[in-house]
Amino acid sequence: MSQQVIIFDTTLRDGEQALQASLSAKEKLQIALALERMGVDVMEVGFPVSSPGDFESVQTIARTIKNSRVCALARCVEKDIDVAAQALKVADAFRIHTFIATSPMHIATKLRSTLDEVIERAVYMIKRARNYTDDVEFSCEDAGRTPVDDLARVVEAAINAGARTINIPDTVGYTMPFEFAGIISGLYERVPNIDKAIISVHTHDDLGIAVGNSLAAVHAGARQVEGAMNGIGERAGNCALEEVIMAIKVRKDIMNVHTNINHHEIWRTSQTVSQICNMPIPANKAIVGSGAFAHSSGIHQDGVLKNRENYEIMTPESIGLNQIQLNLTSRSGRAAVKHRMEEMGYKDTDYNMDHLYDAFLKLADKKGQVFDYDLEALAFINKQQEEPEHFRLDYFSVQSGSSDIATASVKLACGEEIKAEAANGNGPVDAIYQAINRITGYDVELVKYDLNAKGQGKDALGQVDIVVNHHGRRFHGVGLATDIVESSAKAMVHVLNNIWRAAEVEKELQRKAQNKENNKETV
């Protein structure tokens, strides 16, 4: 049996289901590139049949990613499999992941079928997927609540049909680690052709043991772990990949397996996912939380100073978290900024140097010293907002005092035209938003507002993340500045640009569909 554990990332599929607003194709690609840099073996990037937007993003990622295998999800439905293959075919090689429920409860109440019919359907769909690729993964949905003998029948038939990877999910996060290990061991005992496939696991965290279940399964013989960065996902989330990866690395003495992950990219990838998905990482989160390497106890601090291994089982550097440096000021040139970005692991393609340096100089004039975390925040915002903007914040002014009412004046560039409006609101942020909405005429409802400090001290950058509802769809925006009101205004303008771009994409899709229809009529 191979000693490599394949890392299968589903941040962009299962993980995205936890978000209040769907990611754009560009945001998904940004995360996919970070995952590729970290070295994930397989990335599941969407469910193409679900929407034209998901199809487009899967296709874009499949065309771009070269060093990780790109995968798409499909139910055991002919159309699902055909559409997934259509989206993925631009890749040099790809995986189709198809699934059907196998537990008695799901078969009886959801599928209204029988186990024999489920097996027959699974076999047919696996063979259909094999017409497009020899890399087919099959999942037994709700395997954790499927009797092992029934599960063994399904797995044996799926392998005979051509599935190269068999995934055993604990779909509802119900199974205990010793039970889950027993399921994997039971399959190895019961399935005669199990050596012809890789056994995978996909665990959920409803009882807080997703990582424990995955590690127990690996110890029992599973050689692929599925999960998401930071553990994001439906309900209580997925197995946190960074925790599994580092557990395997730190406890290689008893796990006796390894991954091909570049663990020095873990922290940056985690931050990228957190920022783009607008899901802050808890301070006490294992591996990537801000307190993961903090020592407040005097006894612990003394022990760490004498020997870090007294209280640290791994180092911050092992996940790519280096010490903060205070070496950039308004007198630092472009070369110094570029060099520092390279030291932090960024490539030229990760940011626009002209835009980044302009933002750096403005911030350095305000703060004096610019920290690494400032640069990273600027680079992230730079990447998020580098697309052409229809709306641009030209000027704003706010008057407020001890009363509840605030007044804001805003000038907004709308294409080539500058428009101005004033409005009152319950506080400066509300007043700004009322004025912006008057200018654009967009009917948006604010459903989430988050403010996070990026850095330390009174002059730290403030990042505002908002989610708005617009005609039944949710859109995310982000703004960054040392002034909270300015951050809030920038976040709303970012949202409006995302809404505008979505409308333009919809128009383009409709145009293509109409052209296709016209061509049919011509033929």
From Swiss-Prot:
One Gene Ontology MF term: acetyl-CoA C-acetyltransferase activity
GO BP field: L-leucine biosynthetic process
Entry keywords, A to Z: Amino-acid biosynthesis, Branched-chain amino acid biosynthesis, Cytoplasm, Leucine biosynthesis, Manganese, Metal-binding, Transferase
Cofactor: Mn(2+)
Presence of keyword Metal-binding: yes
EC number annotated for this UniProt entry: 2.3.3.13
Pathway(s) this gene product operates in, as recorded in its UniProt entry: Amino-acid biosynthesis; L-leucine biosynthesis; L-leucine from 3-methyl-2-oxobutanoate: step 1/4
Residues at which Mn(2+) binds: 14, 202, 204, 238
Region (Regulatory domain): 392-523
Main location per the UniProt record: cytoplasm
InterPro entries from the UniProt entry: 2-IPM_HCS-like (IPR050073), 2-isopropylmalate_synth_dimer (IPR013709), AIPM/Hcit_synth_CS (IPR002034), Aldolase_TIM (IPR013785), LeuA/HCS_post-cat (IPR054691), LeuA_allosteric_dom_sf (IPR036230), LeuA_bact_synth (IPR005671), PYR_CT (IPR000891)
A Pfam family per the record: HMGL-like
Superkingdom, natural source: Bacteria
Domain (Pyruvate carboxyltransferase) ranges: 5-267
Catalytic EC class: transferase
Catalytic reaction list: 3-methyl-2-oxobutanoate + acetyl-CoA + H2O = (2S)-2-isopropylmalate + CoA + H(+)
Location(s) in or outside the cell: Cytoplasm
UniProt GO cellular component terms: cytosol
Subunit: Homodimer.
Family of this protein: Belongs to the alpha-IPM synthase/homocitrate synthase family. LeuA type 1 subfamily.
Protein function: Catalyzes the condensation of the acetyl group of acetyl-CoA with 3-methyl-2-oxobutanoate (2-ketoisovalerate) to form 3-carboxy-3-hydroxy-4-methylpentanoate (2-isopropylmalate).
Full protein name: 2-isopropylmalate synthase
Organism: Salmonella paratyphi C (strain RKS4594)
